[in-house]
């Protein structure tokens, strides 16, 4: 079995319905996976059942059997029993805190490395990398470690945009990621623009969607990556 992981920048593009833009990306991962477990732990400001319902509705045309991990008395067993894993967006720090709390970090990694499909968006993409050190989120809670799932052996920054609002004097996203590369000049960071996604199939990694991604690594800053690019070298 080989890794089959889809990392979406966001759950929406513009004003599109929830997850609708991602259906063409998600569908290939569901061909042999009917029973999915959804992990809503990033959803701090919403009820987990409400969050689950939005995911079920958003993916309804795929006719999947989706349950929330919070509905199961044994989260680890529920994850083992599922054919695939879905992790949604929200607060990355809270998500990782809960994954450690329920002893799921290593288990998710093991299941994905054995071939269980993984689909994440926003925070769910953040935790697929080496660590959550390049998330955009406020650190509202302290997880035991920033170390994440390591499904992708580099850093991710979903919702990437270097827009600076007129009159705003805070750092841009590119400046924040530059700070990371000054502290860690070896580890690459991929900024994924909304509407785009990374898809890992075994030892192959590609960029899907309509917008370029951006590479930050050492002296390389905000290097555009065209859609369709083969990024497999980043898995080495």
Swiss-Prot record:
Keywords per UniProt: Cytoplasm, Dipeptidase, Hydrolase, Protease, Serine protease
CDD domains to which the protein is assigned, alphabetical: GAT1_Peptidase_E
SUPFAM superfamilies tied to this protein: Class I glutamine amidotransferase-like
Subcellular location: Cytoplasm
Main location: cytoplasm
Active site: 122, 137, 159
Reaction(s) the record says it catalyses: Dipeptidase E catalyzes the hydrolysis of dipeptides Asp-|-Xaa. It does not act on peptides with N-terminal Glu, Asn or Gln, nor does it cleave isoaspartyl peptides
One function term, GO molecular function aspect: dipeptidase activity
UniProt GO BP: proteolysis
EC number(s) on file: 3.4.13.21
GO cellular component: a single term: cytoplasm
Family, as annotated: Belongs to the peptidase S51 family.
Function according to Swiss-Prot or TrEMBL: Hydrolyzes dipeptides containing N-terminal aspartate residues. May play a role in allowing the cell to use peptide aspartate to spare carbon otherwise required for the synthesis of the aspartate family of amino acids.
Name used for this protein in its record: Peptidase E
Organism expressing this protein natively: Shewanella oneidensis (strain ATCC 700550 / JCM 31522 / CIP 106686 / LMG 19005 / NCIMB 14063 / MR-1)
């Amino acid at each position: 079995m080989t890794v089959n992981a889809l990392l979406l920048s966001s759950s929406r593009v513009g004003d599109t319905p929830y997850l609708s833009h991602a259906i063409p990306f998600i569908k290939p991962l569901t061909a042999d996976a009917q029973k999915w477990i959804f992990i809503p732990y990033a959803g701090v400001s919403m009820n987990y059942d409400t969050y689950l319902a939005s995911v079920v509705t958003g993916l309804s045309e795929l006719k999947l059997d989706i349950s929330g991990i919070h509905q199961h008395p044994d989260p680890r067993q529920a994850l083992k029993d599922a054919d695939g894993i879905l992790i949604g967006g929200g607060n990355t720090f809270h998500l990782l805190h809960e994954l450690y709390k329920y002893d799921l970090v290593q288990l998710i990694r093991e299941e994905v490395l054995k071939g269980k499909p993984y689909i994440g968006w926003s925070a769910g993409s953040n935790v697929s990398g080496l660590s959550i050190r390049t998330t955009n989120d406020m650190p509202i809670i302290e997880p035991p470690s920033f170390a994440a799932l390591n499904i992708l052996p580099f850093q991710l920054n979903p919702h990437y945009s270097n827009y600076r609002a007129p009159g705003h004097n805070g750092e841009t996203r590119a400046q924040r990621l530059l700070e990371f590369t000054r502290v860690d000049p070896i580890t690459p960071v991929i900024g994924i623009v909304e509407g785009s996604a990374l898809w890992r199939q075994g030892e192959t990694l590609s960029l899907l969607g309509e917008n370029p991604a951006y590479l930050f690594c050492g002296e390389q800053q905000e290097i555009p990556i065209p859609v369709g690019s083969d990024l497999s070298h980043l898995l080495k």
